[in-house]
């Protein structure tokens, strides 16, 4: 009996080793809500990388950045899309992650810009960030990354939340409130163009406020996850001049438990299959190795670092 059990166990171990040698590991990817960009883009990337590597991808709809970091820390996912500012908070235990510090993840690659857009009603007499004092301003959902973006940008101009009539509204609710003259301005951190602002600009005059170079550089010095970003003229109806602002980055992070080889394989496939990814989702056009390593304030996973050094994106 014992001999037969030993033979069975040996066979099972050999079979498991065979499966391991054949590859086919499943990567659990956390994205965002199933109607959002994170989910659609993550699905597109998973499909392409699943075809181009020996990995398969299980795409999960989630509550986005903070939830995704918590899922990696809990060992429930292996790969996630997050904003690089929220990633910074988690790694350092600040802001959204005060008292909840986690360093169970590493950076893999920045993917695309999420632009800090400050939209104002020109009839409210707002032409600059300084003009927001005393105004009704939505700063995004309470406790969101957008709220912290708003807090940091305002503070760079000497304005606190006590200096405005702060409201916490979603992007679409903010756009509706501005249209109905219930607020004077709102903060929105998202790709540019983004639908809430595009829809608003088709029926209402809007102004998008500049973050000037001096204040932008001061913010970047304090918060290295920011980068300067120009919103091209014509991005929104009636906004006919370039707007200078800041952006954070939608970024892939990975569990520290993933092997160097697995993360190297994913990173390499991500950039070598840019055309196929772009065909599957328009955000693929922003994939760029040089951009992928800028404004990343946490360590890269050794597998990602190996790839970026190999192609000269990191020294």
Give each language-model segment a name.
Residues 41, 169, 173, 180, ...:
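An extracytoplasmic/periplasmic, membrane-proximal ligand-sensing/linker region
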Residues 25-52, 56-57, 114-180, 298, ...:
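Bilobed "Venus flytrap"/periplasmic-binding protein-like clamshell domains
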Residues 84-86, 94-96, 103, 124, ...:
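Pocket-lining segment of extracytoplasmic ligand-binding domains
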Residues 122-129, 258-261, 314:
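Short helix-loop capping/hinge motifs at secondary-structure junctions, enriched
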Residues 135-152, 225-296:
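Ligand-binding clefts/hinges and TM-proximal coupling segments of bilobed small-molecule sensing domains
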